[in-house]
Curated annotation (Swiss-Prot):
Pathway(s) this gene product operates in, as recorded in its UniProt entry: Secondary metabolite biosynthesis
Family: Belongs to the class I-like SAM-binding methyltransferase superfamily.
Keyword presence, Methyltransferase: yes
Organism whose genome encodes this protein: Talaromyces stipitatus (strain ATCC 10500 / CBS 375.48 / QM 6759 / NRRL 1006)
Catalyses which reaction(s): phomoidride A + S-adenosyl-L-methionine = (-)-phomoidride B + methanol + S-adenosyl-L-homocysteine + H(+)
Entry binding sites for S-adenosyl-L-methionine: D135, L136, D162, I163
Broad class of enzyme this protein falls into: transferase
Biological role stated in the UniProt entry: O-methyltransferase; part of the gene cluster that mediates the biosynthesis of the antihypercholesterolemic agents phomoidrides which are dimeric anhydrides. Within the pathway, tstE catalyzes the acetalization reaction that converts phomoidride A to phomoidride B. The pathway begins with the highly reducing polyketide synthase tstA that catalyzes the formation of a C12-fatty acyl-ACP, starting from one acetate and 5 malonate units. The hydrolase tstM is involved in the release of the C12-fatty acyl chain from phiA.
UniProt-recorded name of the protein: O-methyltransferase tstE
Ranges of Basic residues composition bias in the record: 226-235
Molecular function as annotated in GO: methyltransferase activity
Length: 296
C-alpha cells in the first residue's frame, strides 16, 4: 500500500472564504461534458491498470472530478486537464523510463494533483516504490486512489506539503535522494521570486550530481511578465523561453550550480484555447513551455 505523509498547512485549513465564488460550477473553467478526445490515452490506463469497464469510464471520471472540485477548483480540475499527460510527450521520456525501470533511481512529481503521471510511469513498467508525489492538497492525492482504484497495490509515497515550507520534516528525508523531478502546471502559479524559491527547493531534493534533472510543462506567454490573477490577490509570472533560461541563470549563480536548460514554446492546445474566455487568465499570447533542466 502507498505511504502518505500529511502536513496540514494554513491554506489547506482555511475555509473557502473570499474564493467561494470560484467553487461555483457556472465559471468558465468548469466543463460539464467530457469528450473521448479529452480522455485520450488515460482511458487505456483506467481500463487496463484500474480495471474500469469501458462503459463506466466517463461517468467514473466525472464523479471523481466533481469530488476534486470541492477540494480546490483549479482550472486543470474543472477542464479535465488532469487527463492530459505531460511526460509521455517530452523528448526525454524514453530516457526517463530507462533510468527509472532499473529500480536504482527515484522520481518525484511536484504538484502531482491526482498522481496521474505516476500512474502512467507504473503503467509503463516503472517500479512504484521508487516514485513520490507531492501536492499542497492531501485531498487530491486521496482522490487519486479513487480515480485509479489502486490504493491496495500502489507502493508510491505521497507527501502533502507546502513547497515553501523548508522546515517540513518530509523534505529532509528526501533531500539529495531524487534523480528526476517532474513539475507540470506548477511554476506558472507563482511570481518570479517565488519561482526562484521553488527551484531552490527542487535543487535541494535532487542528487547533487551531473544528470539530475527537472522536466515539466507550464503556461507561458509571448509577452513575458507578471500577470494578474482574476478574483485573487497577487500575480504570477509567465515566461517565454528566454526568461525561463534567464531565471535559471540567476538560480545557478545563487546556488553555485550549473544547468543545461532546454525549452520548447508550443502552440495552444485545447485546454488553453478554451481558457481564452478566462479573461486575464489566458490570452492570445498564451503558449505552453515544455522544459528540461539538467544539472551539469
Amino acid at each position: 500500500m502507498a505511504a502518505v505523509t500529511t502536513t496540514e498547512t494554513a491554506s489547506q485549513s482555511r475555509d473557502k472564504g473570499e474564493n467561494a465564488w470560484a467553487y461555483k460550477k457556472d465559471v468558465a473553467w468548469y466543463r460539464k461534458d467530457l469528450s473521448e478526445d479529452t480522455i485520450g490515452e488515460t482511458r487505456a490506463i483506467l481500463q487496463q491498470y484500474s480495471k474500469i469497464p469501458p462503459e463506466r469510464v466517463i461517468d467514473h471520471i466525472k464523479k471523481v472530478r466533481d469530488k476534486a472540485w470541492e477540494v480546490y477548483p483549479y482550472g486543470s480540475v474543472g477542464m479535465f486537464g488532469f487527463l492530459t499527460l505531460n511526460m509521455p510527450y517530452m523528448p526525454e521520456y524514453v530516457e526517463i523510463l530507462d533510468r527509472l525501470r532499473t529500480g536504482d533511481q527515484k522520481f518525484i512529481d511536484v504538484g502531482c494533483c491526482f498522481g496521474q503521471e505516476i500512474r502512467k510511469l507504473v503503467f509503463d513498467g516503472v517500479p512504484s516504490q521508487n516514485l513520490y508525489g507531492m501536492d499542497l492538497h492531501q485531498g487530491f492525492m486521496d482522490i487519486g486512489y479513487d480515480l485509479f482504484c489502486d490504493k491496495q497495490k500502489l507502493k508510491s509515497t505521497f507527501i502533502a506539503a507546502d513547497i515553501f515550507d523548508s522546515s517540513n520534516p518530509a523534505f529532509a528525508k528526501i533531500a539529495g535522494t531524487i534523480d528526476i523531478i517532474h513539475a507540470g502546471s506548477f511554476f506558472h502559479l507563482f511570481s518570479w521570486d517565488d519561482q526562484v524559491k521553488v527551484a531552490k527547493q527542487i535543487i535541494n531534493f535532487l542528487k547533487p550530481q551531473s544528470g539530475s534533472m527537472l522536466v515539466g510543462k507550464h503556461a507561458g506567454d509571448t509577452n513575458p511578465g507578471h500577470k494578474s490573477r482574476p478574483g485573487r490577490l497577487g500575480s504570477r509570472y509567465r515566461h517565454n523561453g528566454e526568461t525561463w533560461k534567464k531565471m535559471w541563470e540567476q538560480i545557478g549563480e545563487e546556488t553555485d550550480t550549473k544547468w543545461e536548460v532546454k525549452v520548447n514554446e508550443l502552440a495552444d492546445d485545447e485546454y488553453f484555447k478554451d481558457g481564452k474566455q478566462y479573461g486575464d487568465w489566458d490570452s492570445e499570447t498564451t503558449r505552453r513551455l515544455q522544459f528540461c533542466v539538467r544539472r551539469l
